[in-house]
Amino acid sequence: MQIVELNGNVLLEDFEIEYITLTHSILEPNGLRIKTPAGVVLHTGDWKVDPNPLIGDEINAKRLKEIGDEGVLAMICDSTNVFSAGRSGSELDVRKNLLNIMGRLKKRIIVTSFASNVARMETAFYCAEQTGRQISLVGRSMHRIYKAARQCGYLQNTIDPIDPRAVSYTHLRAHE
């Protein structure tokens, strides 16, 4: 196994691979510029252009333009809303709206998300703290990703989640 730094390069026999910073709901997404004897292939995986990512770097639009200007034999990409007109919202937009909602409501709020969306998890923690709420993570994947994100230096300035057993219906009912 080889660890590749963000914006790093790897040489694999006839393939020169350059990592390009992208944005998405997962941490540190990268596109790959793969230089082959036949030409350059750009592989992005799933990605989106988020002008205000809350975690991680902004998309390296300058480098993507340079690659396009140099010429690309093929682009292999995936983007969930590619056929939807307009732009998808930023995670910052989600944070502002969730903070507004949580500030107005007085009772229990349940926020659901993909466990892999650490920025969304961080948004939920932030909004809970700003509105004087507690937060709990439910599900093995949520706990696993939370722990991994903390170990990698993310989610460092968040409130501690409470044990999910402490948020049972009967426990909360007594406090409503």
Language-model features: where?
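A short, hydrophobic C-terminal helix/tail in secreted or cell-surface proteins
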Residues: 174-176
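His/Asp/Glu-rich metal-coordinating catalytic cores
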Residues: 1-172
